[in-house]
């Protein structure tokens, strides 16, 4: 499967689990990016190469990675650990919901509104399943 194929698989699987999703396909590389619940549950990077340190994606699906690992709060998953990544993403959202309660959804709306005026990901991303 290609990086783009994995992106659409993730979008489909995460939609099933109730996430609001935006996605972006990079122009200069084959990398793809998914924002979870307008960023409240962080983001996913899908790639076959090391990313830039200034963009700290919490969840990374790495094509060609032999073994999954964690480094400074960032998680790098091999294709073999795809299902573990889905479970970890769901667990992280559950922790955010426990922490913020109903405010979680208020933060989503705030990020959605503020994101409309931002450059970068927000201006180029496509909505996959915006239910808000």
Predicted regions span which residues?
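Negatively charged, low-complexity tracts enriched in Asp/Glu with abundant Ser/Thr
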Residues: 1-41, 68-83, 94, 99-132
């Amino acid at each position: 499967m290609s990086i783009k194929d994995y992106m659409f698989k993730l979008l489909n699987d995460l939609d099933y689990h109730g996430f609001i999703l935006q996605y972006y396909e990079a122009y200069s590389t084959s990398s793809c990016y998914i924002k979870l619940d307008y960023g409240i549950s962080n983001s996913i990077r899908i790639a076959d190469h090391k990313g830039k340190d200034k963009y700290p994606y919490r969840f990374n699906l790495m094509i060609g990675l032999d073994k999954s690992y964690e480094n400074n709060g960032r998680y790098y998953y091999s294709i073999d650990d795809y299902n573990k990544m889905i479970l970890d993403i769901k667990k992280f959202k559950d922790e955010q919901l426990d922490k913020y309660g109903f405010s979680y959804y208020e933060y989503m709306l705030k990020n959605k509104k503020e994101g409309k005026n931002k450059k970068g990901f927000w201006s180029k991303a496509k909505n996959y399943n915006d239910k808000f």
